Amino acid sequence: MAQHAVYFPDAFLTQMREAMPSTLSFDEFISACQRPLRRSIRINTLKISVADFLALIAPYGWSLTPIPWCHEGFWIERDDEEALPLGSTAEHLSGLFYIQEASSMLPVAALFADDNHPQRVMDMAAAPGSKTTQIAARMGNRGAILANEFSASRVKVLHANISRCGIANTALTHFDGRVFGAALPEMFDAILLDAPCSGEGVVRKDPDALKNWSPESNLDIAATQRELLDSAFHALRPGGTLVYSTCTLNRQENEAVCLWLKETYADAVEFLPLGDLFPDADRALTPEGFLHVFPQIYDCEGFFVARLRKMSSLPAMPAPGYKVGAFPFTPLKGREALHVTQAANAVGLLWDENLHLWQRDKEVWLFPAEIESLIGKVRFSRLGIKLAESHNKGYRWQHEATIALACPTHAHAFELSAQEAEEWYRGRDIYPQTPPAADDVLVTFQHQPLGLAKRIGARIKNSYPRELVRDGKLFTGNS
């Protein structure tokens, strides 16, 4: 594989020589950093099983190599990447897989290790959504996930990925993660803190990642990480599991941050060893039981993962100084709720008791029941999924609800050809040879929902959201 020129500050190389265990070769580390990163994907099991996905893509000639720590994860090699980017394939557009670096699948694997089944989870630094969507798949879209992102510009991307993957059990917030320990004390069964870091492990993807690196910045970042971890630990219930991870390699931002928590809270912190997380995990195992993944070990990005359990309750942090404000939604119950449910079921939108109906003016939403106890304690950017807007003639069903809730075997489902599906993604109306009989149509391709539409005569009127419409070459090879 071709090498690329990576910028390494001398002080960084000195630090890595000190941090790297004697069992690893420093020359192999440098060589691995200069190799381009292997591409990898994670199959979205909310929409398709691993076996069915592999059967679906078998004719394409893709070469898939299993990732040891994620049953749904594969390294991928394709001959047609230049002709058709992976993100423009039909399977990606319909949310059947997520393009995700292999190392970044490790934290969620650790979070659910040892048959852990949390019902309320927080992803404290969630964008762009790879780990949130992985958590949702492991939870089977049940329970609830609070997905927080501090960067306002990245919240929109986070929501887009959650929506594409058909996820219904999330609430989005936009806060500095340091508020949650005070705002939501001991409210979560499990928390993932994939902390902001110096990014030393990503040089295979970005050869200039270390251009602004300095030992001093590592220490500044570690101070922020300690505050975030402290907040996360306070938000975790006693007995709950917390995973701390970074995509960096120095000990100050990794082992030292976790050891600081242990020194601060002593017996309240138990480190849970990760040596049995997957075969060969012991090659990256630290004496504390963490995984310190140098890129040459598994031929992936550099990464760090620690898992711990909260053994006892902690004194509360000072109350947050912000005001939440009035909650603008009211529960929808009784006859009204029944009417909405029956109307939704009639067009193929189905849900269970894990989701509850709420209303704001003419909008109807579905909130995960597990998140309702947090209402009034924190301000949400977006909660659950928007199901519909009511109007005089009924309901205007929303695209994100269709992707998350539609039953592709419903009587109104209408399977498109590849050419028709591509036209759909381009925002164009469909003119099938044999139009559907029903006026309300659940449009599908590869038996996956693409949207709800109206049949007008022989034409299916396109309802694909304008902001999602695609141009350029798509999966049939036509521009």
Swiss-Prot record:
InterPro entries: Methyltr_RsmF_N, MeTrfase_RsmB-F_NOP2_cat, MeTrfase_RsmB-F_NOP2_dom, Nol1_Nop2_Fmu_2, Nop2p, RCMT, rRNA_ssu_MeTfrase_F, RsmB/NOL1/NOP2-like_CS. GO terms for biological process: rRNA base methylation. Its main location: cytoplasm. Keywords: Cytoplasm, Methyltransferase, RNA-binding, rRNA processing, S-adenosyl-L-methionine, Transferase. S-adenosyl-L-methionine binds at residues 125-131, 149, 176, 194. Belongs to the class I-like SAM-binding methyltransferase superfamily. RsmB/NOP family. This is Ribosomal RNA small subunit methyltransferase F.
